[in-house]
Amino acid sequence: MLKSAAVIQAAGKGSRFHSNQYKLLTPVDGVPMILRTLEPVLDAGFDEIIVVIGAHADAMRQILLDYPVRIIENKNWKKGQSTSLTAGVRAAANSSDRACLLLGDQPFLKTETLQALLDEADRFPEEIIVPFYEGKRGNPIIVPACFYEQLLELTKGDEGGKKLLKEAGYRVFSVEDSAVLRDIDTMEDMKNHG
């Protein structure tokens, strides 16, 4: 059986959020955003969950303390999202056959969507799996270990895995969950979440 790691990128400052509270600790329906994002991941059946933290590391570590996650601190988080992606993939490389790359600000993902992505990855273990909703590419994506090295070589700045998808190609997986397109970048996104 293939081992699956979930890598949650939660290191950024959330500078577009424009609030007096750190974005990932802002309540979404009464629960801090990072925990709302984590809930379906915990229920989806991953072998390991890695949370990459950076900005507000102490507060993030404290809130994640009681959860079965491995915390990786990205001290280079100011250099862009790709540094968190790199830190998370490196952490997953030793213990997983594939990594599901999640954004910490996607609090509306459903457990069923994550399980469906894992099932698709079981059917196509050598392919990158990318969710699409109504023809639009979303997140999270699942990357097999055979692409880890290529992903690490291609990522820089805030480009994340887009270069890998362009270069290596991917399998389109249609889902009925609009949450794959929704992350919270601004206060306006929060107001419109309902």
Model region roles, listed by residue range:
Residues 1-19:
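N-terminal nucleotide-binding beta1-loop-alpha1 segment
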Residues 2, 153-194:
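Conserved alpha/beta core of the MobA/IspD/sugar-nucleotide pyrophosphorylase nucleotidyltransferase superfamily
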Residues 8, 34, 49, 88, ...:
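Residue-level signal for inorganic ion chemistry
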Residues 16, 59, 107-108:
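A short, conserved beta-strand element in the Rossmann-like catalytic core
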Residues 21-27, 77-78:
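Short glycine-enriched, charge-decorated loop/helix-capping segments at active-site entrances
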Residues 24-37:
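Short catalytic helix/loop segments, enriched in acidic residues and glycine
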Residues 35-98, 154:
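Conserved N-terminal catalytic core of the sugar/cofactor nucleotidyltransferase
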Residues 78-145:
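Conserved beta-loop-beta/alpha segment of the NTase-like Rossmann-fold superfamily
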